[in-house]
């Protein structure tokens, strides 16, 4: 899948899929352009 950046209270990290929990915001490269 497309690498996604997960942003949460613990910081920002990369994930290959959805972020764990609803307290994270997912940013995918295909959505950014």
Swiss-Prot record:
Residues annotated as signal peptide: none
Gene3D superfamilies in the cross-refs: Anthopleurin-A
Key words, A-Z: Disulfide bond, Ion channel impairing toxin, Nematocyst, Secreted, Toxin
UniProt keyword Ligase present: no
Main location class: secreted
Similarity annotation: Belongs to the sea anemone type 3 (BDS) potassium channel toxin family.
Protein name: Toxin Bcg III 25.52
Highest classification ranks of the organism: Eukaryota, Metazoa, Cnidaria, Anthozoa, Hexacorallia
